[in-house]
Design a protein with these regions (language model features):
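A structural detector for beta-sheet-dominated domains
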Residues: 4, 30-34, 70
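Short aromatic-glycine-(Arg/Gly/Cys) micro-motifs in beta-strand/loop hairpins
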Residues: 27-29, 35-64
């Protein structure tokens, strides 16, 4: 599986893709606009990192969805996910 290949992402529902990277943590790709008959890699989308997290100093658990890239083509979001994964995971 490659994070840079959309075929390796799980389509949760039309226009919402998920790539699991750890227990309770994943990237989400939200398709915002995709014109019929065009390549999905050119569709306008946004990339998020989503998960259940724990803050050690405060001893609190929380859910968050943080945007990593907004309103860009899918291929750019895939590149951003790969870059974020290499740098932070």
């Amino acid at each position: 599986m490659k994070i840079s290949n959309l075929d390796d992402w799980y389509e949760v529902t039309r226009g919402l893709y998920r790539y699991v990277i750890a227990a309770k943590v994943c990237y989400e790709l939200h398709i915002l606009y995709w014109e019929d008959g065009t390549d999905i890699l050119a569709a306008k989308s946004s990339l998020y990192i989503v998960g259940d997290w724990t803050s050690i100093p405060e001893h609190t658990s929380f859910f968050s969805r943080e945007i990593l890239l907004a309103e860009q083509p899918v291929f750019e979001c895939l590149k951003a996910a790969e870059k974020d994964y290499k740098e932070n995971i």
